[in-house]
């Protein structure tokens, strides 16, 4: 395979993990970061100890503080940043891009102020003439396991399947299997909203409830995700795939999940401010819950689990009381509630 340069915007766990994959595939990954300490550590020690402790990076993984240097000559630019920084980084990227480039984003969330998906934010901020294609790379994955080269599967979603296949070719190897899909909306809705349900799974575990409760929460949570997704144009089949149920399972059941860990602390009685301070990293489900709370009301979509998690996060609702209210809702036929 011909070596290609790929720029990765974001020196966090996911950006660094994807850089490792690209280096394993004999490509030339360059990470753009904004902290001297992390950039220098990647270049000098070949580690990123804050985000991926105990992982040794291939020497081919490079990092820079210069956006221009990172994207110069890159076939693909991967945007691997928290959703709250997406708009400002895309403004910078729009100024820096000199020619049409394949853009890939791996950020899972909804912008609360606008209810826009991340691809919509990117499209607003980066000129169409500079976007050769926009691909969503998503699925059931923890960066830590990708960096350990454990078997993982993702899906590259794009309206232009040729572009999705290019991304597939750059990242696929014996440790990371990539599928393609043309349902960008479904991939983004599944990836964003599962973080809310993962908070709920963590809360359930923190309260001491068992597997029955978590299985019910995940299943009914997926019903809510599908309901909203279909309302905004997703293919319902997408939610039975990697970016739907696959991503939900891994995020709700793993101690690697930031959203599960945050929910677990909430379930044990800590308040949101304490939890976020202890986490020290972005918990996307908190921001997404705020966005979807208003979005569901605007669309008149019934999302009782999401509403309950919002109330626990932002209205100091007692978690056990929230569960009691959910369990006491009027009876329904299951298939009519999807």
UniProtKB/Swiss-Prot annotation:
SUPFAM superfamilies reported in the protein's UniProt record: 6-phosphogluconate dehydrogenase C-terminal domain-like, NAD(P)-binding Rossmann-fold domains
Domain of life: Bacteria
GO molecular function, one term: glycerol-3-phosphate dehydrogenase [NAD(P)+] activity
Residues annotated to bind NADPH: 13-14, 108, 143, 258, 282, 284
Keywords, comma-separated and alphabetical: Cytoplasm, Lipid biosynthesis, Lipid metabolism, NAD, NADP, Nucleotide-binding, Oxidoreductase, Phospholipid biosynthesis, Phospholipid metabolism
InterPro entries the UniProt entry points to: 6-PGluconate_DH-like_C_sf (IPR008927), 6PGD_dom2 (IPR013328), G3P_DH_NAD-dep (IPR006168), G3P_DH_NAD-dep_C (IPR006109), G3P_DH_NAD-dep_N (IPR011128), NAD(P)-bd_dom_sf (IPR036291)
Any one annotated GO CC term: cytosol
Role description: Catalyzes the reduction of the glycolytic intermediate dihydroxyacetone phosphate (DHAP) to sn-glycerol 3-phosphate (G3P), the key precursor for phospholipid synthesis.
Protein name (Swiss-Prot/TrEMBL): Glycerol-3-phosphate dehydrogenase [NAD(P)+]
Organism: Listeria monocytogenes serotype 4a (strain HCC23)
Upper taxonomic lineage: Bacteria, Bacillati, Bacillota, Bacilli, Bacillales
């Amino acid at each position: 395979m011909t070596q290609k340069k790929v720029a990765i915007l974001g020196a966090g766990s996911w950006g660094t993990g994807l850089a490792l994959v690209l280096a394993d595939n004999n490509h030339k990954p360059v990470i753009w970061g904004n902290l001297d300490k992390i950039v220098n550590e990647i270049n000098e020690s070949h580690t990123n100890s804050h985000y991926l402790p105990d992982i040794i990076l291939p020497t081919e993984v490079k990092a820079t503080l210069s956006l221009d240097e990172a994207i110069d000559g890159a076939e693909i630019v991967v945007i691997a940043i928290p959703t709250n920084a997406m708009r400002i980084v895309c403004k910078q990227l729009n100024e820096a891009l000199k020619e049409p480039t394949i853009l890939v984003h791996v950020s899972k969330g909804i912008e609360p102020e606008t209810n826009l998906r991340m691809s919509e934010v990117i499209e607003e901020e980066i000129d169409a003439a500079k976007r050769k294609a926009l691909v969503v790379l998503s699925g059931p994955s923890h960066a830590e396991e990708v960096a350990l080269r454990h078997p993982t599967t993702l899906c590259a979603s794009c309206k232009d399947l040729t572009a999705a296949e290019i991304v597939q070719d750059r990242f696929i190897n014996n440790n990371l299997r990539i599928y393609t899909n043309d349902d960008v909306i479904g991939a983004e809705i599944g990836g964003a909203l599962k973080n809310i349900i993962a908070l709920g799974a963590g809360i359930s575990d923190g309260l001491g409830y068992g597997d029955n409760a978590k299985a019910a929460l995940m299943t009914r949570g997926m019903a809510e995700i599908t309901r909203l997704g279909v309302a905004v144009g997703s293919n319902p089949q997408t939610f039975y795939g990697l970016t739907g149920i696959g991503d939900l399972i891994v995020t709700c059941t793993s101690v690697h999940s930031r959203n599960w860990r945050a929910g677990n602390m909430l379930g044990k009685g800590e308040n949101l401010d304490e939890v976020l301070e202890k986490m020290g990293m972005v918990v996307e489900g908190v921001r997404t819950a705020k966005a979807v709370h208003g979005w569901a009301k605007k669309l008149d979509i019934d999302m009782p689990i999401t509403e309950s998690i919002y109330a626990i996060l932002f209205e100091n609702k007692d978690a056990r009381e929230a569960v009691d209210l959910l369990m006491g809702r009027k009876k329904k036929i299951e298939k009519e509630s999807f």
